């Protein structure tokens, strides 16, 4: 049974999507995860739908943003264990590429892209908070394909000391452990405010 709108948390797909529509939340979220500085966030569309061809499986992306360098970031919230998570990530990244490249375009026009899944479970059972995947040479692990694609799985149930304190606090907040710093407090205030938004309430009810 679906949650009442007033009970939604950041880890709920709908709430995550609406909160991350605001650059003042998605920008520090990405900066904390990737340990980079982003000058500007752009939203090509509020919620990205990609349908390449009739008969092909389309996708709706929770969060699709670009930075000032036109790097693409796709953020997805995943709260249920999914056996097909790796292949789903592969499909999403492929669809993003197909959406970017126009017919006849040079492959150099493909943008660097990150597909990031925030999971409230550990899909690999290794205790890591973050699993980062890039294409590498099996014979020489130091050699990357440098194809501009990165897949990241975040695990809110991580137990290892493998991420920054800021990222640990963020993942703990997503997992429902409460606020512990300025950013998680800002996120909680955004969630409380969103619960009072009548338009979003109606949008949520329409989806149920």
Question: Model regions: which residues?
Answer:
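Short, charged alpha-helical interaction segments and adjacent helix-coil junctions
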Residues: 1-6, 10, 14, 66-68, ...
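C-terminal segments that line or cap access tunnels to active or ligand-binding sites in enzymes
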Residues: 148-151, 156-160, 171-174
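Accessory alpha/beta interaction modules
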Residues: 1-150, 160-162
């Amino acid at each position: 049974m679906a949650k009442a709108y007033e009970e939604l948390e950041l880890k709920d797909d709908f709430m995550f999507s609406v909160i991350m529509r605001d650059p003042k939340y998605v920008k520090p979220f990405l900066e904390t995860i990737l340990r980079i500085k982003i000058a500007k966030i752009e939203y090509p569309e509020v919620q990205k739908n990609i349908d390449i061809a009739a008969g092909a499986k389309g996708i709706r992306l929770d969060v699709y943003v670009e930075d000032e360098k036109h790097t693409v970031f796709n953020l997805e919230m995943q709260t249920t264990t999914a056996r097909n998570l790796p292949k789903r990530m592969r499909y999403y990244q492929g669809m993003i590429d197909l959406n970017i490249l126009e017919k006849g375009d040079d492959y150099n026009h493909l943008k660097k892209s990150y597909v990031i899944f925030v999971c409230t479970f550990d899909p690999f059972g290794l205790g890591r908070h973050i699993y980062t995947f890039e294409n590498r040479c099996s014979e020489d692990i130091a050699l990357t394909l440098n194809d501009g694609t990165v897949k990241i799985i975040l695990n809110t149930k991580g137990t290892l000391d493998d991420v920054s304190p800021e990222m640990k606090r963020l993942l703990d907040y997503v997992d429902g452990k409460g606020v512990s710093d300025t950013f998680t407090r800002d996120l909680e205030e955004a969630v409380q405010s969103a619960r009072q938004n009548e338009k979003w309430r109606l949008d949520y009810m329409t989806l149920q």
